Structure formats: C-alpha cells, structure tokens
C-alpha cells in the first residue's frame, strides 16, 4: 500500500533528532525511500509526485545538518558529503518536475530519464551509508588512516555523483532545446527551464 508507506516515512521523519548520526540516517532513509518509490511507481509522473513528497518531508534533516558545526571532529568533508546527497535529490526533484511538462520528451524518454536519476541517487546513497560507522562508531574498529581514507573516498565519490547529476540534467535539457530549435520554439524551452547559461 503506497499511501501507508509514505505515512510510515513521514512518521519516521518526526523523530526528535538528538545527534548528527540520526540526521545522517534520516537523510539516507529519505533518499532510499525516494529510490524505492521510483522503482515501484507505474510511470514517470507518479514517480516524481511521490518522490517530491518524500524529499519535502525530509528537507528538515538537511536544514538541521547545515546548522551542525562539528559533525565529526576535523572533518568538514563528512558534512559536505552528506549535504551533497541532498543536493543530488534536489537536482532530480526540481528539474525532472519541469521535464514532465516538456512536450519535447516522449513518455518513454521520461521514464528512461527518471531511471537515470534513480541510479545516481542509489549509488550516492550507498556511498553516504558507508560513513555511518565513522559518525556513530560501532564495534567496527578503524584507525585514523582508514577513517581519513574512507572520508576522502566518499567525498570524491559524492563530488563525482553531483557533477554527474548536473551533467545528466544538462544533457537532457539540451536534447529538448535542439528539438525545440527545429520547430523554432526555443523560447518555450527557456521559459520552462530558465536561461541559465550552464544549460545551453
């Protein structure tokens, strides 16, 4: 039952967040739910509507995390890595919502684009999940070098995934622009997405 599933997510996100580890786990849970929803939704529009709700419900985690001064002693990269997971989700929610109203894409193409965003979110969420043992130490023992190496690796992966999400967006918007240009309808594309030079 999809509606019940979303309700469960909302309840989870009402927890009182008392430590950074819970913030990170909340963000990971939110993105994982977005990925799961987009895999089970019947089409691109329903996918976007469901995942947008989940993203908005989880937004409080990102806002609270931005206010945390010391997530891990001496490692701003951990905080930046987690926040990039939110950035990637936002890139999908904001841009794909516009693509859904773009007549230059077919339904099949929109489904394929959604699948591409899904893959990027899934991989980036897995990377962040690896940081949990650093943020909330468990029985897993890591020396300083191992921790630093893990943080640097995950940070590098997240920078890559964020760039990939932006590149993927630009690539798809450029397809729309070229199709519109053939019909002399470029202005409609600019009106929909804006004239940000990074897209064109």
Where are the model-predicted features located?
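Extended amphipathic alpha-helical interaction segments
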Residues: 88-168
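Residues on one face of amphipathic alpha-helical coiled coils
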Residues: 36, 43, 50, 57, ...
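A cross-kingdom marker for long, charged
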Residues: 174-200
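Long, charged all-alpha helical bundle/coiled-coil segments in cytosolic proteins
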Residues: 47-120
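Alpha-helical heptad-repeat coiled-coil segments that mediate oligomerization/polymerization in large
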Residues: 30, 40, 106, 172, ...
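Start-of-domain marker
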Residues: 12-74
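Perimembrane helix-loop junctions in membrane proteins
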Residues: 36, 64, 137-140, 174-181
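Single conserved hydrophobic/aromatic residue that forms the stacking wall/gate
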Residues: 1-10
